[in-house]
Every structure is written in structure tokens, then in C-alpha cells.
Amino acid sequence: MWRAGRAAVACEVCQSLVKHSSGIQRNVPLQKLHLVSRSIYRSHHPALKLQRPQLRTPFQQFSSLTHLSLHKLKLSPIKYGYQPRRNFWPARLAARLLKLRYIILGSAVGGGYTAKKTFDEWKDMIPDLSDYKWIVPDFIWEIDEYIDLEKIRKALPSSEDLASLAPDLDKITESLSLLKDFFTAGSPGETAFRATDHGSESDKHYRKVSDKEKIDQLQEELLHTQLKYQRILERLEKENKELRKLVLQKDDKGIHHRKLKKSLIDMYSEVLDVLSDYDASYNTQDHLPRVVVVGDQSAGKTSVLEMIAQARIFPRGSGEMMTRSPVKVTLSEGPHHVALFKDSSREFDLTKEEDLAALRHEIELRMRKNVKEGCTVSPETISLNVKGPGLQRMVLVDLPGVINTVTSGMAPDTKETIFSISKAYMQNPNAIILCIQDGSVDAERSIVTDLVSQMDPHGRRTIFVLTKVDLAEKNVASPSRIQQIIEGKLFPMKALGYFAVVTGKGNSSESIEAIREYEEEFFQNSKLLKTSMLKAHQVTTRNLSLAVSDCFWKMVRESVEQQADSFKATRFNLETEWKNNYPRLRELDRNELFEKAKNEILDEVISLSQVTPKHWEEILQQSLWERVSTHVIENIYLPAAQTMNSGTFNTTVDIKLKQWTDKQLPNKAVEVAWETLQEEFSRFMTEPKGKEHDDIFDKLKEAVKEESIKRHKWNDFAEDSLRVIQHNALEDRSISDKQQWDAAIYFMEEALQGRLKDTENAIENMIGPDWKKRWMYWKNRTQEQCVHNETKNELEKMLKVNDEHPAYLASDEITTVRKNLESRGVEVDPSLIKDTWHQVYRRHFLKTALNHCNLCRRGFYYYQRHFIDSELECNDVVLFWRIQRMLAITANTLRQQLTNTEVRRLEKNVKEVLEDFAEDGEKKVKLLTGKRVQLAEDLKKVREIQEKLDAFIEALHQEK
């Protein structure tokens, strides 16, 4: 009822609105009116022929009695005939965005409420700790009032200062990585840093290696590495020297270099170097003077030599052997104090401690290099030149110290080797022996004095030097004992002169100037000099150096001309022998012969490129067919020929050819090409060159050939390219002309006839000689051959009955043959029947195939026209044509690889081998041998020695 009353009130309101709206102009937009007002407006203005558009949504017709449900009604804009249509897409977009905002806002409110509720739940789960507040002291709550944190922060160091004090992690990481690489490199010294297991399985004890052993092992390994690089450096220096010679030889004629004048002592040192090599090669000893420094180990030999050279140039050790090979030191005067080795151009500045350390290290490396494995000392000499202001000109040789006992770590023959080296130098009648004796030890412990007295019993070329006189004066109770030594009354030896020197306080870091000052100060204050036990000219190393130099040059002037005359006589004898034995040959030493042989070998390698392509392809094709013919006939042709029709034959052939090409054929082809290249290379290297052929190079050429072939490897990609080419060649079945057809038939006949001949020989060996050979050569058959002959005859009868018999015998056929033979009294085994059948059927098949081959000579027309004739199927001819074409294409491909790539690579290998042989002196001595080579070597050495001696003698006379 209340709804009906409410509707009636609404109708009255509407009617009143209509009455008052009669004055509204008609141009008022209808869209601005309310929906209800629009319906009233249209009912009172029928002149407006408005067309109501169809609503897109279902709706209800409203009246005054119906309920207005505006939230369910969706109206669309109304089109009027006189008003254009308007599009309100911004309004629709805004409405959608407003709806999205409400969704987001609602979600945010709901999420915040949920988060607050979760936080409250967690807060309620935390226990209340207010009851335990009494445990904390009261001053804790007031501590911030008494502590000024700002002052503490200022008192602490800054972050930059802390960073500067911190270790450099990059450097530490780099050092650790270097140590890790060093210890994991598999070096021999690696085990020194590992614990050694000495316990049982249950209880293991580890023993740590001492620091000294670790350092020694590291130094040993470092020295080995340096020795290796030292060899490389020497080889490079040798190459540089050879290149320098070549540059000088190719100098322009218009440019003349000024010849540097060498000093007298340098010329003499070069003579000694050449003589040293000559003596080592021919086990002889020259008689030119040199100062030989000998003494007991740790007697001070090296220190005396360093005082004379005015530089600490030798490695030093505390009581251990440091001089492991003779060191020849040539002293000469010069503006700068420098040292250099004979075989190196590097100069060491002896005024700089860095260069001195490098020189000592270099000498130690050279000594270790000279010492062979299993030895302690070496007789090979290290040549060193020292120049400086105030140095006395002479040549000294520092020898290893004489020992009395061989200690652990030394070779068993160390003592004898040192004695033999010392005797070899002291046996020279013109050598000056500088005998060094330690004054701080008892004279009875001396070993070297006995050795010197044996070599120079009259003391005509011996100078005695007493070292460590300062220690001797302190330790010896009777000073007269030192006087007896200096006067030559204590030791059983004689000498030209006696000297007393002081070579330092025992500190290896002392400089030469400090040692000289200490020596002069000691002798100025010494009781020995004040009491006239020692004379002034017998003390200090300076006086010793002057005396040794005077004695040295006196010996040189007396003996050098005699030595030159002896070499002149030797040269005359060698030249006479050469003229009598080799009058038409030039005198070529081993190096010159090697260069000549090198040029000949390279010319012969170049000859490989002169081989014609036709010759390459012929020998390649022939060699390849010889290698693969057995496989083609036995594994491809014969199995396929047993088939009944041409389709099966072609299928079998294609399958077997594909398998053969994929697996074996390319590899076989490369092997054949490599063997062919070797044969041609050997032919050029070994073929005689007529009367001009020199057999002295034969061993060298053979060695170069073998080493080059060993190093040469065929290109790895050759097989892959060959496989594709061979596969494509075998796939082709179209024979284009009659000439190719005839060539294939000839190729097939030749192959089958060769197999037939082999089969005939096998049958002949099986059945024995025929009646003609038995009568003419008196040969008989064995019992087994008779059985084979009877079996063969029986099987041939079977083949005559059935000309198209398959390749295998059936079991009943074997039984029939055996019964027939037994009926004639021949006992035969089934396996013997099968073996005989194999050869008999093989001969029958090959003869049939040859007859068929003759028939196919006229079959090219049928093949070309594709006629189907069962009596004339020439598929086997096509097979052999495919094989022949594959061989030709393969030979052509291999020839291109040979001429374009492999010959050049072989030539490169030959050059590398020759370069390696040129650097290996032992290899040249082994390969270039003979009386002629040795005689030329002797002539070259003797001429060089004589020329240097003559130049030295001339300069010596000019100096006089």
C-alpha cells in the first residue's frame, strides 16, 4: 500500500512539472533533461518526430505504477534527426580508471589491516621481560652520560692509516701462486717440502726437512734451470757469431773497416785457447807458458788470484769445493776494469757489485755445465779475460783444490781426477807453478807440496806462496817456523821465490781495497818484518804479482819461438801427406764439407719438383692397384660374380664398394702416396752421379733422408677429401666411348690373367710335376701330391658335366667324390677335397670370365643402347671400368697433393734436419768421417795455430 501511495505522489509531481514547463523553448538540448522529463517532453511535443533507437540491453516499460530500478538499467545515447552523434570515449576511460582506483584502494586498506593484525599476533607471542629488568646494573642505563663516543672516534686512527698498515693482498696472492706453481711443477726438489711417512699403519710419524736442505734443493733446481737456459744462450751467441762472420764476408769492396790492434797478452791468450782445443782433440799438450795455480782445498788459491786480478770474481764457499773445472784468466791492462768470456760479447763491470755477482754466478753455471753427470770435477777449461788499470799482463789457470779424502756427495774418482788435471798442467816444462800453502794449518798436513816436488823437483819454475800469515802469526808459537817455510827449509820442495800474503780476514763480503789496506797495515806492524824474518820484497800480493808477471814473460820469450818451429814442422808434414794422397782435391774441413753436402742435398730435394706429372700419376696408379688388386678381385668381384642375375651383381658391388671407400681405400691411397714420395726421394738421394760422386757424403745423406722421413707427416685432411672424390668416381657407371670400353676390357683381362697364372702355379705345387717334367727333369710326385692329382681329376669331371656349377660343393657331392676315389684305392679326406675344389673351381671360373671378356668386346653397342640381352651382360666390365677410373682420379689427386704441398713440406723438413745437424758437432763428427776429413781438420788447426803464433812473435819483437 505504501508503494501505491508513493507512486501517486510521484504522478502528481510530474503533472505539475508538465504544466509549468509549457514555456520551455524547443531548442533546449534533450540530453540535459532527466530521463523521466524526456518522456514527458516527448509526449507534450508530438511535432518532434523523434525516433527512439533500439536499446542494446533489455529494458522494462515504466509507468506510474511500476518501480523504477535505475541501477539495473543501462541506457545508450539517443540519436535525433537534427543532432549529430557524439563519441564520449574519455568519459568511458575515466570511469574505468575510477573503478580501478577503488579496487586498489580497497586492496591496500585490506592488506594494511591484515599486516597490523599479524604484527599484533607476533607481539603477543614475545614474552614480557620487564620482570627481569632488575638483573641489569643501574650504571648501564647511565653509561652514555659518562662516555663520549665522539672523543673515542677521534682518537682512533683513520681508515687511510689502517689501509696503509694492512698487507698488500695482491702481492701475497701473487707470491702464493708462484710458490704453488713452483712446488707443483714436478721438480726434483718438490719432495723436500713434503712430510715423509716413517710409521706403521696405525701410528705414522712425520719428519720435517731442515731449512738448510730446503734451500740447498731449491738452489740446485734453480741452477739446473739456469744451466738449461745457459745452453740456449750459448747456442744463440754461436749463431750470432756465425751471422757476424757472414756479414763480414759479404762486405762491400768499397768499404774498408779499420782493423783493431789487439794487445800482446790478448794475442797470446787466443793462441792458448786454440792450443787448448787442439790438445783436447788430439790428446797432446803444448809447451807454451802459463801460470798454474795449485794448492790444497781452502788454502786460498782463489783469494790470491782475486787479489792479483783486483776483483772478487770467483764463487766462494765455506769449506766446500767451489772450483770444479780449470779457469783460465787472462789479465791485461786497460782503461776500464771489466771482464768477459771468450765465447761471449757481454762485459761485466767489475766496479759494480751487481755485475760482480752476475759474473760469479755465470762462472758457477759454466762449471756445473762442464761437469758431466756422475762426476764432481771436469777437465774442460773456462776462458775469462780481465782488463783493468794497473793489472800485470799474464795468463793464470786456477785449478780445483787438491783433496785428501773423498766425502759424501762426491764421485768416487774425484781425488784421482783432480790429481790428473793438476799433473796435466804442471807437466808442461814451461808452465809456472804457483804453489799456494795455507799458513794457518800444520805444514805436515800439506798435500800439494809433494805433488809440486814431483813435477818440478829442482824448483826452476815454482813460486811458493804462504797465505793467511796473519792467522799463522797468532796461532804459531814459534815465529821461526814461518821463517823456515819462507826460506824453503821446512817443505821438501824447491822454488824460484817465496812469498807471504794476507788475503783478508775470512769475510767474503770484504772489498779488494779493504783487503789490500789490511794486508799493508798488517805487514807494517808485523813482528816478522820488524825482526827481519821476512824481507820486504817477499810480502804483499802486489810484489807477488810483479814477480809472477816477470817470470811469465821471461818464459814466454824463451819458449814461444821453439813452439812455433814445432808447429811449422807439423804443418809441413800434413801438407806433404795431403799432396801425395789427394792431389786434385781441395782441403775442406768438416764444416766446409758439411756445407757442400748441404747444398747437394737441397739440390736433390729440388729435383723432386722436376718430376713430370705423367710420371707421378703412372707410378701412383700402378702402386695403388698393386696394393688394392687383391681386395678388389677376392672380396668384391668374385663374391658378386657368384650371383645369378645382373641386378644382384650390381647391388652386391655397390654395397661392397661403399664399405671399402668409407673404411680402407682413402687410407691405403695416402700410404701408397707417402711410400711413393719416399721412393722417389731415396732414388734422387742415392743414385750415382758418375765420376764426380763423392762417397764421403753417403752416411750424411742417408741420415738426413731417414730423419726427414721420420719427421714428415702427410696432411691430416687428405683422407677426407680423397674419400669424397673416390666415392663420386665409383658411383659413375656411364662409359662414354668405345675407347674407354676397350681400355676397361684390357684392364680386366690383365688382372684376371695374373690371377689365373697364380692359380695355375698353386695347382702345380699341389699336384706336383706333370709327365713332361717327370721325364725330362727326373722329378717325382709325393704321395700327397698323387692324392691331390686324383682328386683334381675327379673334380674336373664333375665340372665338365655341370659347367655352371656353384662355387661350393654340396655334402652329397663330396661323398660322391670320396666314394669314387675309394673305389680306385685312393683314401681322401673331405677337407682335402674342399681345398682342391677351391683351386680347381677358381681356375675354371677365371677361364670362363676371360672367355666372357672376349665376348664383351663387341658389347659396347648393346651397353650404349641399353639392350637387354641375357647372353651378353657385361656388368663385370663396367665394374673394372669404375675401378680403373677411380685409380686414375685418385692418382691425379695424390699427384696434386704431392707437387703442391708435400714436396715443399718435405723440403722444409730437410732444411730443419740440416740446421739441427749443423749445430750438433758430435753428429757431424759421426757422419763425416775418414782419413781425408781428419787430415783436413788437422791442417786447418795447425795453420790457425801457426798463424796466430807468428803474429804474436812479430808483435813481441816489436815490443822489444
From Swiss-Prot:
InterPro entries linked to this entry: Dynamin, Dynamin_GTPase, Dynamin_N, G_DYNAMIN_dom, OPA1_C, P-loop_NTPase
Transit peptide stretch: 1-87
Family annotation (SMART domains): DYNc
Keyword Translocase: no
Post-translational modification (record): Cleaved by OMA1 or YME1L downstream of the transmembrane region in response to different signals to generate soluble forms. Cleaved by OMA1 at position S1 following stress conditions, generating the short soluble form (Dynamin-like GTPase OPA1, short form; S-OPA1). AFG3L2 is involved in the regulation of OMA1-dependent processing of OPA1. PARL-dependent proteolytic processing releases an antiapoptotic soluble form not required for mitochondrial fusion.
Region feature (Stalk region): 589-836, 874-928
Region G5 motif, residue ranges: 501-504
Enzyme type, top EC level: hydrolase
Tissue specificity note: Detected in brain (at protein level). Detected in brain, brain stem, heart, kidney, liver and skeletal muscle.
One of the GO biological process terms: mitochondrion organization
Region G1 motif: start-end pairs: 295-302
Name the UniProt record assigns to this protein: Dynamin-like GTPase OPA1, mitochondrial
Taxonomic source organism: Mus musculus (Mouse)
Gene (UniProt): Opa1
